[in-house]
Amino acid sequence: MRKRKLSESSLKGWLYLLPALLFLGVFMVYPLVDVFVYSFEEGYNSASQTYMGVGSYNYSYVLHDPYFLQAVKNTFILVIITVPLSTAIALLIATGLHAVKPLRNLFQTVYFLPYVTNTLAVGLVFMILFKKTAYSDGFINLIIKWFGGGAVDFIDGPYWAKMFVLCFYTIWVVMPFKILILTSALSSVNRDYYNAARVDGTSKRRIFMRITLPMISPMIFYLVITGFIGAFKAYSDVVAL
């Protein structure tokens, strides 16, 4: 009797999941399999939807393409720099916001604005800040000149300058979401842990390392994973710049 109830419960659960599974199968699994099959077809004619043969030429061509290899290099640099930095800075800001009670909601709104701003609009702002033209060196170059440095063309100039702008832009765009998530995570930590630690005379640094970080570590892990995924898929950011 108990096994029958369990089987009925399992069947009911699978029926609830069926629409979502069908959606995933039709719109995610099938396209992935289809594209994987297409990748081995050589000499494909889109008009007649025919191909000449099957092989690994497409993979060989891509892996020997200098533009593709450069794109892979740029992507890995972007991921390695932006994900740890954006998460660490967001954690510092979220900790500060959590500690400051007055105007907390105002600061949260201000920090969240870049996340809801149009990507192209943000890209134009960065162009004005960094791009060197015949009429203006850009706002950042003006600051550099004030300190006695020379103007740098961050957009069309050296490789390091372009990567700096792209990394800075990516961190600035993704950080608001991370601040929001981490602020919520910090607010959910039970205050009794902090009160007990203060009674024992524990320092603030030790409280942060031993209580705060372990309690919000699942959210940090989530942000790191989603940050890696988002950075590997970054395309609109480059187009906007």
What does each of the following model-derived ranges do?
Residues 4-241:
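A structural signal for multi-pass alpha-helical bundles of membrane permease subunits
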